[in-house]
Amino acid sequence: MTGEQLYIAGNYGDLNGNTALDHIAKWDGTTYSEVGGTIGGAVPLIVLDLLASDFNGSNLLYAGGRFLTIGGVSALNVAVWDGTAWDDLDGGLSRTSGFAQVLHMTSWDDGSGPALYVGGRFNLAAGNPISTNIAKWDGTSWSSMGSGFDADVHELVAFDDGSGEALYALGSFSMVGSRP
């Protein structure tokens, strides 16, 4: 992907009557076009967040939401578009029980290099246990961020309050790990 591009996503089955634009599309200023195919899985399907990032040196579009496939690729709730094809992120994010979903993503550097931070409702990454409802993707693999949160993480924001940039989480949780 090069230059500025506008992508839209959401809870829709078609756009202007075109079902190929299911849940995600690209706008060129005149018309909408397909972004590598549609999403699939158990209903309801939705793409809840898009993030364009070059944190690993490549211009990539990350999609997060509630889906099992995107563009014919198995991708549990999170995927990356390189301008040509979708790819899963090492098996994606899921839950041991109930439905999983990615609600928000942001790019941030915690001092070990820029990475993708993901919040939502999940406790497995690539089928392995991970911090509840928050995870870090370094471009190769998932890692935990402490023990996580007791409920959904709706938003992640990097902010410098004057003492250095930090990552803040907002959501419907009341506990961070074992702390209220």
Predicted regions span which residues?
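Extracytoplasmic surface signature
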Residues: M1-P180
